[in-house]
Regions:
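Charge-rich alpha-helical segments
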Residues: 1-102
Length: 102
């Protein structure tokens, strides 16, 4: 199971999931679609999410389509459902999208 020690302060904020109001729920996963100005910005975002995912050892499904839309989906594959790790990861992805450094 991933350990999010570096991001522990975010866990406390996840008691109230309203921080994730831009995320939907589908097929036992949470997802969000992000829109960018162009392909390069979308790809840069994907690379940032990929780096974070490696760091926390929790990996999303990522879909880039129509050259500027990115769909990020999380579910804990070993449990086949959404867990706190997924909510935590989604919150961190939102921070990346908002331009905050982690």
């Amino acid at each position: 199971m991933p350990i999010f020690k570096k991001y522990k302060d975010y866990l406390d904020r996840l008691e109230d999931k309203t921080d994730l109001n831009m995320w939907g729920f589908d097929n036992n996963s949470i997802y969000r679609i992000f829109q960018f100005e162009d392909f390069n910005k979308a790809l840069d975002f994907i690379n940032h999410v990929g780096k974070l995912s490696e760091e926390i050892d929790h990996h999303p499904d990522i879909l880039l389509y129509d050259y500027k839309f990115v769909k990020i989906s999380f579910k804990s594959h070993d449990k086949n459902k959404v867990t706190i790790d997924d909510y935590m990861s989604a919150h961190l992805v939102d921070k990346i999208f908002d331009g905050e450094s982690l």
